[in-house]
Amino acid sequence: QDLFQLQKNANNFEGELAYSVGDDQLSTSIDLTFNFTFYGQTFDKARMATNGCLHFGLGTGNINYNDYCGDFTPDPISSQYTYTMFPFWTDLIRDNNSRMKSWGDSTKMIFGWYDMREYNRNSDNSFEVILYPNNSFEYRYDELDIINHDVIIGEVGANSTQVYQYLFHDECNTGTTNSSACVNTNWNNTSSNTLLEGG
């Protein structure tokens, strides 16, 4: 499905909020417009990470780099993080055209990463997480353009028994560790990119 595009369609989402988040950093705490239950825990706030993750339960203060997806070389999802959605975890950074935004009402809460650049490269990556009051959620994608970093899509609850890794693009010449199943193909040339990009 198409993105709601809080950046391009701001007039349709009055009161949308934008976050000036630095490289490998975490947004301020964002109030949800309804309580959201995720793996048995109910949350009323979330925080967006530049690298493409949505964290619940991190509080409102400064957070240690190791407690959110500040790591720019994602390894397979483990219990290092808890109550986290990984719509598109990779090494992303904002440029002058990039935006990280949120907007919500009683029917949905949207978190959007728009025109995010792959670190050290001129590219655009746009995707969203949408939460619903019935505690369901979805990931949506538009352009995706990554050639020098690994990519993870998934979610994690309270511990390692609640890890769901939908996709781990493990390119052999990137990242800090590589599995025996790593591939010598960049993300842009995969069927996963073809499937997700633009819908």
PLM segments and residue spans:
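Extracytoplasmic Ser/Thr/Pro-rich, glycosylation-prone low-complexity segments
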Residues: 1-199
